[in-house]
Amino acid sequence: MKRIESATAGQAGRLFDIMVRATELGCAAFYPPEVISIWHKGRSVEGMAGVIAQGGVYVLIDEQAVRGFVHFKDSEIVGLFVHPDDQRKGYGTELFRFAVGKMPVRPILIKATLNAIPFYAKLGCRKVRTESVRRHEHDIYVVRMKLS
């Protein structure tokens, strides 16, 4: 049975693995390998546990396994990741709709990787602008999207 619930510190390793695997595989056609490795530089399971402790991180569990997670704060989706083995099963859509339902303020903002644009567009989000995020002296291009 599927359910969405608050993430726990004990799930930090699984969430970190999902994030790394999803970005390595999902972003490979859109970003060079060195950019993807920079993205992960300095991130850790301990860091993920710290994010979970701050709240706003929810996991989707199906068949007793974490399949993906969403992290949101105020009216912004900070991250939404589904394990590559579990993509195209509707988990990302469920996590997105759950997060939107929890956010009291509109518009909702999303900072999306280039590969995620079609996913968010399908859910009614529109592109606002392309921007760069500076990480370890490199610019990583992402798209700011909005759901009104």
State what each model feature region is.
Residues 20-46:
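Conserved GNAT-fold acetyl-CoA-binding loop/helix
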Residues 55-68:
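Conserved beta-hairpin
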Residues 2-17:
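A short beta-loop-alpha structural element at the N-terminal edge
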Residues 121-131:
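Conserved acetyl-CoA-binding loop of GNAT-fold acetyltransferases
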Residues 77-87:
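A short, internal acetyl-CoA/4′-phosphopantetheine-binding micro-motif in the GNAT/acyltransferase core
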Residues 111-118, 131-148:
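C-terminal "cap" of GNAT-fold acetyltransferases
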Residues 70-75:
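A conserved beta-strand-loop-helix scaffold within acyl/acetyltransferase catalytic domains
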Residues 88-101:
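Conserved acetyl-CoA-binding loop-helix of GNAT-fold acetyltransferases
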